[in-house]
C-alpha cells in the first residue's frame, strides 16, 4: 500500500547561509553540475553549508530511465573536455579534503565515460594532492576494461550503488542488473584491493527486512567495505511511489547487522544518501 504522508522524522529545517550561496555561485560560474541539485537531495543545504558537494560529470542528462530517479533523461550533451580541470579548480577554491564525483549513465559512449572519470580523478589529485577522492560510478554495462580505466586512476573509494533488492529491479531499475552491479564491485576490488569499495541502497520501496539483509550479505561476499542505507523519497507522482516510511529503529537494526557481518563503515538513517557525510570515511582510509 502506498504511503503519502511524511512522518516527523523526515521533516528538515532548511537554513540557507553565505556558504550555501558561495557554493551555488561557484558551481554556476564554472558551469558545473552537482547530483545534490539534480536529484533534489534533502541534505543539500547541510552539505553546501559545509562547502561540500557531489560533482555530477558527463552532463546532466541520463540515457537510462530508472523510475526512482529525478535526473533528466534523454539525449545527452557532448562531453566537456575541460570539465576535469574545472572540477579540480572548484575543489581547490572550496578547499575540500574529501570530494565525491559521480555521473549520469552514458550508454551512448563507447566506454560509458570511464576515461573521463579517470581524467577527473587525476586532475583533482594533480591540483589537490592531499584531497581524498571517492567516485560513484555507473555499471558501464559490466565492461571490465571500462572499470579498469577508473581503478587505474587510483580513487581512494570506488562506489557503485545496488539501489534496491533484486526482486524490485524490473520495476525500479529495469535497464540495470543486480548481479552485474555486484560484479562491478567484485571486479574493482580484485583489480586493486587497496581501493575501498562502497555501495548504497534505498528502502521503503516494498522490500522486506530479510531481503535487505540478504543484499548486505551479498555485498560483503564481493568484498564491499562501506554501505549506506536511506529512505526512498519519490520525486513526483510520475515516479515510483513510496510504499513505506521505514522507522529510524529499523535503520539502526540494519546498521547493527551490517557492522556484525564485517562492513568497515555504515551510514543508515532515513535521510542518508550515498554521498552523505562521505568524508567521515577519512577516519578509516
Swiss-Prot record:
Q: In which pathway does it act?
A: Protein modification; protein lipoylation via endogenous pathway; protein N(6)-(lipoyl)lysine from octanoyl-[acyl-carrier-protein]: step 2/2
Binding sites annotated in the UniProt record for [4Fe-4S] cluster 1: 36, 41, 47, 275
Q: Which residues are listed for [4Fe-4S] cluster 2 binding in this entry?
A: 62, 66, 69
Enumerate the spans annotated as Radical SAM core domain.
48-264
SMART domains linked: Elp3
Q: Which cofactor does it need?
A: [4Fe-4S] cluster
UniProt GO cellular component terms: cytoplasm
| GO-annotated molecular function | 4 iron, 4 sulfur cluster binding; lipoate synthase activity; metal ion binding
* Pfam family for this entry, one: Radical_SAM
Question: What are its E.C. numbers?
Answer: 2.8.1.8
Source domain of life: Bacteria
Tell me the HAMAP family matching this sequence: Lipoyl_synth
NCBIfam families per UniProt: lipA (TIGR00510), PRK05481.1 (NF004019), PRK12928.1 (NF009544)
Q: What is this protein called?
A: Lipoyl synthase
Q: Which organism is it from?
A: Caldicellulosiruptor saccharolyticus (strain ATCC 43494 / DSM 8903 / Tp8T 6331)
Q: Which gene encodes it?
A: lipA
Amino acid at each position: 500500500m502506498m504511503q503519502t504522508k511524511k512522518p516527523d522524522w523526515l521533516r528538515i529545517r532548511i537554513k540557507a547561509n553565505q556558504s550555501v550561496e558561495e557554493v551555488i555561485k561557484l558551481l554556476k560560474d564554472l558551469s558545473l553540475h552537482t547530483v545534490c541539485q539534480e536529484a533534489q537531495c534533502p541534505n543539500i543545504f547541510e552539505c553546501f553549508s559545509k562547502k561540500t558537494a557531489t560533482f555530477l560529470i558527463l552532463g546532466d542528462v541520463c540515457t537510462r530511465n530508472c523510475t526512482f530517479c529525478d535526473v533528466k533523461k534523454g539525449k545527452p550533451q557532448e562531453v566537456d573536455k575541460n570539465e576535469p580541470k574545472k572540477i579540480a579548480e572548484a575543489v581547490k577554491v572550496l578547499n575540500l579534503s574529501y570530494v565525491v564525483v559521480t555521473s549520469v549513465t552514458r550508454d551512448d559512449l563507447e566506454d560509458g565515460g570511464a576515461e573521463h572519470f579517470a581524467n577527473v580523478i587525476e586532475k583533482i589529485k594533480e591540483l589537490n594532492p592531499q584531497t581524498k577522492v571517492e567516485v560513484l560510478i555507473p555499471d558501464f554495462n559490466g565492461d571490465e576494461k571500462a572499470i579498469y580505466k577508473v581503478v587505474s586512476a587510483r580513487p581512494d573509494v570506488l562506489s557503485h550503488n545496488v539501489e534496491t533488492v533484486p526482486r524490485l529491479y524490473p520495476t525500479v531499475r529495469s535497464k540495470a542488473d543486480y548481479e552485474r552491479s555486484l560484479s562491478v564491485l567484485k571486479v574493482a576490488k580484485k583489480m586493486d584491493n587497496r581501493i575501498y569499495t562502497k555501495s548504497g541502497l534505498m528502502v521503503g520501496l516494498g522490500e522486506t527486512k530479510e531481503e535487505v539483509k540478504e543484499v548486505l550479505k551479498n555485498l560483503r561476499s564481493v568484498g564491499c567495505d562501506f554501505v549506506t542505507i536511506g529512505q526512498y523519497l519519490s520525486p513526483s507522482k510520475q515516479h515510483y511511489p513510496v510504499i513505506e516510511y521505514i522507522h529510524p529503529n529499523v535503520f539502526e537494526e540494519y546498521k547493527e547487522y551490517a557492522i556484525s557481518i564485517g562492513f568497515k563503515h555504515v551510514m543508515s538513517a532515513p535521510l542518508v544518501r550515498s554521498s552523505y557525510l562521505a568524508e567521515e570515511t577519512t577516519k578509516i582510509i
